[in-house]
Structures are given as structure tokens and as C-alpha cells.
């Protein structure tokens, strides 16, 4: 049986600050990174199987072309009427469709539990054969009961032939899957029960995945929530901070993060479908009367939950939660063909540090999934950086992203080391139509952001705190411009910063950009990102050009505990 952070949490029982932090820290990557390799990926993309506009094979080819080391086919649950080449299922002879009869667009649909198992997975196996150096995961975009969407994937026990686990998850828990034909079916994952209506059902789904992982029914999995601000608060179909806390409590080893930077980065609102309008004074409000301004568009291509210093993500981190941040393409249709998207890997990448645990010189699906869970990851726009090491050190104790450093008392001299590298060029191509000019990817400055860790919040004892999406202790404690770093013999930029007399538990995270503070309509006086809608309104710059002008990266946190 796998070591479960959930069981350790139960033992800690939300006691003191330190016992609470131990409960959350007992996962992978508790120390500095072991020998491994940085691998780039994208786990949210669409094909003709659902609402994408290009074939399955085309999207796999583009993922490879843009240099991704790994990716997941992750598209909507529910039911669809066509296959990955756009052929209607009911034109097959014989008709292969199983389950309850339903129609969409005049054609019979196939429920996703079947297409995932019987059609998509064989194509994933073909993809693995075609690109043996890459890793193509089996996943889907979960329509979360009571909420919006979520990227999921499972590494099955028998990867040569078995996609039944992801099929069982989709059938039971996807709110758009109305099929009832498999109710009471006995599977290796238990008896199937339809549980797909309420928030409580979504929590049960996370619990189910956690149980499968703990009990060895599956080798690995992730549940990472998608474009989290798009539908606003939970009352309008989105998410509140307490929802993420519930999911993480139920599945700490599988439900461990969200997409801080949504896909659809060529969209007018850099990923969101709801408008944010700004007046001549720069005051911005949502077009939806019942939603606050933070749900309209993005801030430097990043959602408000992540971009706001001291906001929702920082509230999660302030508990010491291993809750990590990722980015994807959410590719449906390329902007040059009338869509809102870059190809997978063309603009946004999630970088994962994978450890070669079995020493075979390759990186397995398990090792990549473990790397995501470890939190030793970061994401970047437009290849602003293609390498990042972020470490905290106290004497001989060291921790990297996602890890923890534990000190017996106050730390006299906490050493923060940042090592990063930018490429000479990225995938921007000036064509005179969509993009007039391309700047080299170059970091202007990096912010070191810190907040206090006060421990897990008990929803029964502190209900108001449990629903509070803020962390007022979070602040930018240092900003590093080009004169703050040196270049080593490998061409990496290196920053060393010392924090004296650390006498309380804190987390540290990074964000960096190619833009200077006070860049008109892009950043404020101290360098915080402004609403992307300002650039559209005031300068008329939109689409791909806006995205290539405005590049950011975000690290995941390091946790430092002082007893």
C-alpha cells in the first residue's frame, strides 16, 4: 500500500501548527531534488473526439513538433457523436455504440466512458509507438459535479492494454454523462455507482481516486482543476477556495492543484469567455453584474486566483497545503485558422522535474506523474525561461520547489538560490498579419514572494477562515533585476539572496516577466500585472501579438518550517 498523506493527516488531526504542516509535507520531494531531468508538458488539449477542430493524430503531431516531452489527451467527458477523425459513430458498420441511446446533432452519441476505453486508448498506444521518446498520457476533461472543468489522467496498472480505470471514473462522476447502463457493474475498481450531481459528489470522486491510488488499483493519477475563474464563484458554476480545500482534503495525493494560467491565450481575454471592461481611468469591472471584477479576463495571462499577491492560491499555501500551479494550451483550434489557441507547447509549457527512480535512463509515466505531485514544477509563457532551479538552504538542509525545509529553531541565515536560463529565441514568428514583431525572450525581473504558514484550517472549528480566499501575510520581499544576477559557466543566470533571522514558518514562490514596472497598461508601479483587457482597450493590441508581448513565469513554492 502506498504511503498516504491522508492517513498521516488523520493522525495529526489538525493539532498544532507543526503537526498540521507535517501532515501535508509527508509526500514526495520532502528534500532537495534528486538526480533527474526537466521535462516540458501540456495536459489539456482537444481533438475531433470532442469539441476540437482537428484530428487526434494532428494534435499528437503538433505536441511532438513543439518539443513537448509529455502530454495528455484530456478532453470533455459526457457524450459525443463523432470519432477522432470527425466520423459520426452511427455511420460505422456495425454500429459500435454501447449504453443508453441518446442523440446530438441528429446523430447517436457514444458515451465518453466507451470512447476513452475502446477508441482513444488504442490511438494513444499508437502515438506511443510513433513517438517512443515522448510520453502520451490517457486523460479526460472532467465536467465536475457542481462546478466547472478539471484535467484528469490515470496511469493504469497495465499500460499495455488497460484504460478501464479512467473509463470507470468518467462513467461514475462526470456530470454530463447521463448513461445508466453500467450501474452496479463490478469492476477491478469496485461496483460502479452514478455519483455526478453535487459538490459532495465531486468530493467523493476525489476520494475514489485517492483510494484507488492508495490501494494499488492504479499506479498514478492527477486531478488538476481547469480555467478556474471562468465561471466565477461556485454559485455561478465556478470554484470557491473552500471547494479546493475540500478536494485536497479528500484526495491529497491526487487532487493537488489547478491551472493558474488558462489556455486559449490568443483569446481577447487571454483564456476566459467573460468580458472585463475598463474605463478611461483604468477601472475595470466584469460584464456580468453578479460577478466581481476578478472573474473577467486574466492578468498577464494568469488568472486572478494566482496573479493576486495574497489571493486564493496564497490562502491555500498559507495552510501549508501542497497545492500546485500549472499551465496548458487548452488547444481546440489554432488562431491562424480562426481559433483562440496556440498549439500545445507553442506558447505555454509546464515543466516538471522527473526523477529516474529505477535508473533505466528513461522517464516513465509514473516518474512524470510523481514529479507533478512533488511540486517541483513551474510554468512559463513563450519560453521566457526553459530552466529553473529554486532552492532554500539552512546549513546542510536544503529544499527545492514543492519540498520542505524543517528547522529546529529560528534560522539565522536562510539562503535562497535561483538559477534560470532563457533561450535565444522562442516560437514567435512575425508574419505581418497576426504578429508584427517578436522580442527575444528575456527576463526583466523576478519577484520573490513570501507568506506565513499558519497551519491547516478546520472547517468545523473555523468556518469563516475556511471560506476566506486571502492571505494578508503574503508580500513581495525582494525583486531582482538583471544587475542582481551573475552568469555561470553553463550560461545560467544565478541569484543568491539571504534572509536573516527567520523565526516563523513561511513559504516562498517566484514570478518573473519580460516587462518592466510601469509598462503602460501591462504592469503597475511595482511590477504587478494589470488586467489584459487594458491593452485591448487602450492600445488595440489583441490576440497572439498581445500574448507574445507579455511573458511571465511562475514557480511553485518552497515550504520552510520553524519549530
Per-segment meaning from a language model:
Residues 2-11:
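Bacterial N-terminal signal peptides that target proteins for export
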Residues 145-163, 230-256, 333-353:
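Substrate-binding cleft/loops of secretory-pathway carbohydrate-active enzymes
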Residues 195-224, 237-254, 275-292, 304-320:
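Histidine/acidic residue-rich metal-binding segments in metalloenzymes
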Residues 227-229, 262, 356:
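Short, structured patches in soluble enzyme cores that scaffold and shape functional sites
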Residues 77-83, 159-162, 260-279, 515-521:
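Short, solvent-exposed beta-strand-terminating loops
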Amino acid at each position: 500500500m502506498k504511503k498516504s498523506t491522508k492517513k498521516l493527516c488523520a493522525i495529526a488531526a489538525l493539532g498544532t501548527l507543526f503537526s498540521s504542516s507535517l501532515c501535508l509535507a509527508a509526500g514526495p520531494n520532502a528534500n532537495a531534488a534528486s538526480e533527474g531531468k526537466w521535462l516540458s508538458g501540456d495536459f489539456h488539449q482537444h481533438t475531433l473526439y470532442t469539441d476540437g477542430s482537428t484530428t487526434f493524430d494532428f494534435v499528437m503531431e503538433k505536441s511532438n513538433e513543439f518539443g513537448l516531452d509529455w502530454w495528455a489527451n484530456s478532453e470533455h467527458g459526457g457524450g459525443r457523436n463523432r470519432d477522432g477523425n470527425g466520423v459520426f459513430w452511427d455511420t460505422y458498420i456495425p454500429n459500435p455504440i454501447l449504453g443508453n441511446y441518446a442523440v446530438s446533432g441528429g446523430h447517436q452519441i457514444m458515451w465518453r466512458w466507451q470512447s476513452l476505453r475502446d477508441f482513444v486508448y488504442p490511438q494513444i498506444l499508437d502515438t506511443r509507438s510513433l513517438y517512443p521518446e515522448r510520453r502520451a498520457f490517457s486523460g479526460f476533461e472532467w465536467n465536475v459535479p457542481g462546478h466547472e472543468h478539471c484535467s484528469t489522467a490515470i496511469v493504469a496498472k497495465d499500460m499495455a492494454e488497460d484504460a478501464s480505470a479512467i473509463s470507470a471514473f468518467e462513467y461514475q462522476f462526470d456530470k454530463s454523462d447521463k448513461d445508466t447502463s453500467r450501474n452496479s457493474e463490478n469492476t477491478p475498481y469496485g461496483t460502479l455507482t452514478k455519483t455526478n450531481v453535487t459538490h459532495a459528489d465531486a468530493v467523493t470522486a476525489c476520494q475514489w481516486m485517492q483510494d484507488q491510488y492508495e490501494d494499488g488499483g492504479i499506479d498514478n493519477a492527477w486531478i488538476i482543476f481547469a480555467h478556474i475563474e471562468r465561471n466565477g464563484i461556485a454559485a455561478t458554476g465556478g470554484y470557491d477556495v473552500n471547494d479546493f480545500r475540500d478536494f485536497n482534503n479528500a484526495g491529497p495525493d491526487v487532487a493537488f492543484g489547478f491551472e493558474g494560467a488558462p489556455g486559449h491565450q490568443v483569446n481577447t481575454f487571454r483564456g476566459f469567455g467573460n468580458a472585463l471592461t475598463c474605463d478611461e481611468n483604468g477601472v475595470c469591472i466584469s460584464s456580468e453584474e453578479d460577478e466581481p471584477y476578478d472573474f473577467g479576463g486574466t492578468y498577464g495571462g494568469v488568472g486572478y486566483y494566482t496573479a493576486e499577491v495574497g489571493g486564493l492560491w496564497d490562502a491555500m499555501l498559507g495552510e501549508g497545503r501542497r497545492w500546485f500551479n500549472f499551465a496548458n494550451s487548452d488547444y481546440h483550434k489554432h488562431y491562424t485558422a480562426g481559433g483562440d489557441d496556440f498549439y500545445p507547447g507553442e506558447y505555454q509549457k509546464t515543466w516538471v522535474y522527473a526523477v529516474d527512480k529505477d535508473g533505466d535512463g528513461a522517464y516513465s509515466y509514473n516518474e512524470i506523474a510523481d514529479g507533478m505531485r512533488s511540486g517541483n514544477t513551474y510554468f512559463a509563457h513563450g519560453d521566457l525561461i526553459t530552466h529553473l532551479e529554486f532552492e532554500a538552504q539552512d546549513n546542510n538542509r536544503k529544499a527545492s520547489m514543492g519540498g520542505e525545509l524543517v528547522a529546529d529553531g529560528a534560522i539565522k541565515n536562510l539562503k535562497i538560490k535561483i538559477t534560470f536560463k532563457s533561450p535565444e529565441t522562442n516560437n514567435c514568428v512575425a508574419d505581418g498579419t497576426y504578429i508584427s514583431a517578436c522580442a527575444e525572450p528575456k527576463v526583466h525581473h523576478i519577484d520573490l514572494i513570501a507568506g506565513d504558514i499558519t497551519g491547516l484550517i478546520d472547517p468545523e472549528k473555523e468556518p469563516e477562515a475556511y471560506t476566506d480566499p486571502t492571505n494578508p501575510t503574503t508580500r513581495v520581499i525582494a525583486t531582482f533585476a538583471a544587475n542582481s544576477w551573475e552568469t555561470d559557466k553553463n550560461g545560467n543566470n544565478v541569484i543568491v539572496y539571504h534572509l536573516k533571522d527567520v523565526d516563523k514558518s513561511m513559504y516562498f514562490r517566484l514570478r518573473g516577466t519580460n516587462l518592466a514596472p510601469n509598462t503602460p497598461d501591462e504592469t503597475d508601479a511595482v511590477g504587478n500585472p494589470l488586467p489584459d483587457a487594458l491593452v485591448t482597450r487602450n492600445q488595440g493590441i489583441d490576440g497572439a501579438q498581445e500574448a507574445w508581448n507579455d511573458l511571465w513565469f511562475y514557480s511553485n513554492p518552497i515550504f520552510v518550517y520553524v519549530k
